[in-house]
Amino acid sequence: MKATKILIPTICALTGLLAACGGTSDEVSQEAQSEPKVQEAPAPTPDQQVAGLEAMCAEAQPAIAARQAEDSLFNRVGGRDSIHKAVAETVRLHQINEPIKHLMEGVDPAHLTEQVTDFLVLATGGQGEYGGRNMVDAHAHMKMNNAQFLAAGGDLGKGMTFAGWGENEKQELLCAFVGLRPQVVTSES
């Protein structure tokens, strides 16, 4: 009965139908204020979020391996064009994502898109050549922290969605991305 007592005045207040609900905004406000408030848990820290991702990826590893045994990620996402589309959108998002956009200053987005596409084509089972730097050398100067790593991963997720990738394929590449974290995160702040 207590939930109904709170819910009806709240719905009335939100919909602006106070007269139809038989009360005034003051009555609704006083009644809502008298109910105890539930304390929300604090948001997880970037370190906690990364630990959660690492645990999720470890748990998903058998399913990922089974999918890879059937067909490469490269083939399942539609090849180079699909990878390029996801990477181009990810790079575009990096340029406007507040926590990481400063890392993109002075970077040629077209060149970066081609380099990352070449890297991912090979990493996902496609054929080609990658002539870029290794992960450590490519990211050391950035002094990236976990919060920035998560921001970049969020952009990657959006890029894969933009390219039309399925949930399993997105999870697979994000888990590979999480596996590279020790090579790219070099700062704790």
Residue ranges and their predicted role:
Residues 17-20:
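C-terminal motif of bacterial Sec signal peptides marking the signal peptidase cleavage site
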